[in-house]
Amino acid sequence: MGLLKRAARAWKLAGQADSPPAQPARKEPTLTRTFKMARQTRLNNSWTGRSNAGDADHVIYKDHETLRQRAREQSINSGYAKRFYRLLRQNVIGPHGITMRSKALKADGYADDDMRRVIEQEFKKWSKRGNCDVTGRYSFVTFMWLWIDTLARDGEVMVRILRNWPNRWGFALQIIESDLLDTTLNTWLSNGNRVRMGVEIDEWEKPIAYWLKRSHPGDNFERPAEQEYQRIPADELRLTFDPWRPHQSRGFTWTHAGANDLHHVEEYAGAELIAAEQGAKLTGFYEQDAEWVDPPGDEDSDDADQGVIIEEIEAGSARLLPYGVTFKPYDNKHPSTNFAPFTKAAVRRIAGAFGPSYNRLAHDLEGVSFSSLRSGEIDERDFYKCIQQFAISELLEWVGEVWMECSMLKGVLKIPPRAWDRLTPIEWLPRGWDWVDPKKDSDAAKTGIETLTDSVSDIMRRKGRDPDDVYNQISEDIRRFKRLGIPNPYGKALQANGVTHVEPDEEDDDEPNATGTD
């Protein structure tokens, strides 16, 4: 038995040695959110409800029409929204528009001034009212005003180019509201492309064509019984919107982040205005004592006791009230003392959402120092410069290229095919701004030129001027001053830079130097 017990014990130990050690029971880790932004508590349930994991088109699709219609309503009835669109018109496009400048070159690489002059003059003619737009209502400047207004308000705008248009250049533009691009049109096509909210795209999400309704959905004068679409190729029509996310097919209003605050501010201000108006009109109330006055409507009472007191008020007069009637002044607290600071804080939020500074959006320069005004002005100008470059890349470069092609085909521009690349380059010059502090900014520009960290041409471009135009104008001024015997104001500047002579025109060859100095 002792032998058997020892054998059993040895067998048991051998089995334990071969088997793996027992693993402890798995314990699931406790997960905690590291980012406060991702935590879900009772205090941010509303935020969680607004979150959405859909793609860009899915998110835009649900609210697209509501966003557009509410933005249009505010553009009509809200002074702050109207101010925002006016600021874009003034600062992005400007009073004279974004100017086209030809950069044609001769075969030797120097500027072809004659060709540049011809191209720019023809474009100016085309830009006049009645030439550039299919309706004949707009000049190119007013067309761009409408374009930037529509882009910011609706979030998207379409421009169609019409080749072989019956004008001198065979070219015109048509601006189209995005209502005609059917948001509900989403399907796959037999050619393998798909339509997302009216935009036909290929497998790489490149726009191929746009499916437009033949009439505006809000046109109450002419609405066909059955809606039909027209397919416009993408090389004829450009849909412009400010991209928010990748894979996005449509845009939405630029005012979306501040529109809700703007709505409440307008409602609050309107209510305060009405309350203040009523308080100014209503000075007080008459109270009747039942012991002295008969009940209104009593047949035995006099006409004067019917509860109606006829008032005729004039300066320096007083009235004796009937017995039992006392006057109780109405103490109106509107507008409240919190009206101004609350409105100011709310408009600051709106300005932060829209883009321009609060001082510009609200027309409020109260308490603004010169240094803070200068800092804010520079930052705000960068905001407009970004939109200027967006307009150039999205629309103007495309318009310039097609206009050049159509003008050459119509024979307006005599450009041989072999010189196309040399004669057709153009540059778009957006509006600039004057210096906020002329003396300091002028000294800084001078220092930049002297230290070779800046150029005269770049300084001129920042002010919205073409350097070639400025140089030619200065040269012409000098010749004109000399011809008319007027002292030359450029003399000191030219002498300081070592310039003592400017080549005169042919008719001035026998006259002394044109700098106005001896």
Curated annotation (Swiss-Prot):
First-listed, main subcellular location of the protein, grouped into a coarse class: virion
Family affiliation: Belongs to the siphoviridae portal protein family.
Residue numbers spanned by region Disordered: 492-518
Organism encoding this protein: Halomonas phage phiHAP-1 (isolate -/Gulf of Mexico/-/2001)
Superkingdom classification of source: Viruses
Gene Ontology molecular-function annotations: DNA binding; structural molecule activity
Compartments, record wording: Virion
Keywords recorded for this protein, A-Z: Capsid protein, DNA-binding, Viral capsid assembly, Viral contractile tail ejection system, Viral genome ejection through host cell envelope, Viral genome packaging, Viral penetration into host cytoplasm, Viral release from host cell, Virion, Virus entry into host cell
Function description: Forms the portal vertex of the capsid. This portal plays critical roles in head assembly, genome packaging, neck/tail attachment, and genome ejection. The portal protein multimerizes as a single ring-shaped homododecamer arranged around a central channel. Binds to the terminase subunits to form the packaging machine.
A Gene Ontology BP annotation from the UniProt entry: symbiont genome ejection through host cell envelope, contractile tail mechanism
Cellular component terms (Gene Ontology): viral capsid
Assembly description: Homododecamer. Interacts with the terminase complex composed of two small and one large terminase subunits.
Protein name: Probable portal protein
